[in-house]
Amino acid sequence: MKVQIYQLPIIFGDSSKNETQITQWFEKNMNAEVDVVVLPEMWNNGYDLEHLNEKADNNLGQSFSFIKHLAEKYKVDIVAGSVSNIRNYQIFNTAFSVNKSGQLINEYDKVHLVPMLREHEFLTAGENVAEPFQLSDGTYVTQLICYDLRFPELLRYPARSGAKIAFYVAQWPMSRLQHWHSLLKARAIENNMFVIGTNSTGFDGNTEYAGHSIVINPNGDLVGELNESADILTVDLNLNEVEQQRENIPVFKSIKLDLYK
């Protein structure tokens, strides 16, 4: 499976310019060999939290329409990061994915809101776990958002249910880059799966985003990584490595869920 990761500099509070930027990246970088494209967290408006009442998408309407067009045009599955999204008068940080036929194949609201950013004052936390879902080739994957990375429990269910890839979409700060590396590697090792961390780059006020989008294999080895600059990372994944690692180190056969209460 060939995966292409878009490490974008999100334009603060301007969904139109962000859509234009993404469109240009597709036009410049897409080719028929790519199976999956991945976008970062909150790519429509960034963390313009105080103005999301006016700027957030309405029930994924605009964001889904935009991504659906790209998926159908380029015949590619898109793990579409996440967007600020109003539903039932509440604002969510909503991750979603669209297959190459233009079908919505996943929707997930960020469960863990970041207290350090006062997200709870502006956003509503999701109430459902991240589910496994199928890409066009039948591969089961899952999609989580940024701060979710610090909660290993959230990935256990989709991993145990057969997901072979975990996509963490993020706006992760440079000040915690060491945590980004360590936590992504840990999630890959403990679940015997590929983990893909897709981050943004650039500045949002005084916050510098770390970039360093990264792919880690089920053994915890580095497959590919970007630096802090805006760029694209393309990797080829051998998904047989997941089954091999789960046979060699059968953690899900050894797990004792009844004891972990």
From Swiss-Prot:
This protein's species is Staphylococcus aureus (strain 04-02981)
What is the top-level taxon of the source organism?
Bacteria
Q: Which reaction does it catalyse?
A: a monoamide of a dicarboxylate + H2O = a dicarboxylate + NH4(+)
The kind of enzyme this is, by top-level EC class, is hydrolase
State the Gene Ontology terms under molecular function. omega-amidase activity
Q: Which gene encodes it?
A: yafV
Active site located where? 41 (proton acceptor), 110, 146 (nucleophile)
PROSITE patterns the UniProt entry points to: CN_HYDROLASE (PS50263), UPF0012 (PS01227)
Cysteines joined through disulfide linkages: none
Signal sequence interval, chain numbering: none
Query: What is the protein's name according to its record?
Result: Omega-amidase YafV
Query: Function of this protein?
Result: Hydrolyzes alpha-ketoglutaramate (a-KGM) to alpha-ketoglutarate (alpha-KG) and ammonia (specific activity 3.87 umol/min/mg), has weak activity on L-glutamine, almost no activity on deaminated glutathione (dGSH) and none on glutathione. May function as a metabolite repair enzyme.
